[in-house]
Amino acid sequence: MSEPTKRKLHVAIITSGGAGMFCGACMHDNTWTRAMMKQGAEATLIPTYTPIRVDEQNMTGSQVFLGGINVYLNYRSRLWRRIPPFFKHWLDTPWIINLATKFGVSNDAHELGALTVTLLEGEQGPELKEIEELARFVGNELQPDIVCLSNALLSGTIKTIREHFSGPLFCVLQGDDVFLEELGEPYRGRSLELIRQNVQQLDGVLVHSDYYRDFMSRYLDLPRDHFQKVLLGIDLEGHDGTPTENPDEPFTIGFFARLCKEKGLHNVVQAFEIFHKKYPDSRLSVGGFLGKENEAYFQKTTKRLAARGDSYKYWGSPASLAEKVAFYKSLSVLSVPTVYQEPKGLFVLEAMANGVPVVQPAHGAFPELIEKTEGGLLVPPGDPRALADAWERLYLDREYRLKLARQGYERVRQFYSAELMATESLQFFQTRVDAAGFVKNEPQLTPDP
């Protein structure tokens, strides 16, 4: 008699849209979802607040839960909260939300303090009906084996989801502290207090680096054994750049990330001014999403590059994967010298995947990535001169630059593919589902009479 076929593992990931911008966390969630499906699992990506924007196949459904417009109106108006959900659902339509984001709906942390607190209050706050709708969908309709929140800012939903879903519930941390630290008081303190309370109800917290596990263990006051490190990975399809050395092409330094102060664009500009004085044939290329709240910073930071003439090029925000890959392929080296301590570093993996070495600050997750891939150099954080010196080393020693490029190119494929990420995470999830099922169905022992 043949063994019964084992049911596919079903993982539900609840992600947050980035209000019209390319968001590293939701792009990672999208890649993760698709990779698990390719491995034969069932995976559902559930968008909240706004639709997600990605440069690959979008894996989310058409319904947006906790729609940003309704969440904001619930926060602002008691009358609006009393309106039956049936009459409000049209505002959760993706094209309506996307239209609203074009007219100045902001995701700037300074403006979202009070709203963040109300969401973290969960069923005690004004978003109860929206949270209940999400929880009923997950627990009653979808009925997955695993639920994974994409960030701790969604932790206000945990208690209500628990009322409808009894399986393992996790949360991935992908830079939540960066958002929280930008909130003004009293919102920062209250938000952190609520998150610390909410995450106690989780079965575990997932992170992508040892650094972030140790940091968030202290930050959230959670024991380290409550954390699980899961592999960070990228979909390598379409990343067709290769390690090359063309002496006829100018040495081009690249910056690719959200164009804001915390990503360290000003550090790159200062370092390039130092470097370009010595090597005037060099080039600087800048690309990434520019939000309205960062336009003044961007203009002020790049204004000083006008004197460099054609040595500086602004690519804007590539609208497709092909455009992004074309940007990487034009570079000799990538540097995103973040001010904050980066928990992931997807842009590092993307650059290496296209044969481009990196020079990064020696903090956050970067040392782990550089150590494992040997695809770049580390410099002291916040030191433009050290950054320029590292570029100079690669400029003068093209063979060494090519060696780093080859090592990064090969080891990203060896250690950081989406396939490997899906395989390892599904193995972990399966063990937790099996353990939960064993405990649930284990016969109760009775004491001897």
Positions of PLM-derived features:
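Carbohydrate-associated surface elements
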Residues: 211, 233
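Conserved acidic donor-binding segment of nucleotide-sugar-dependent glycosyltransferases
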Residues: 372-373, 377-384, 393-398
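A short, well-ordered alpha-helix in the C-terminal region of glycosyltransferases
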Residues: 386, 393, 400-414, 421-427, ...
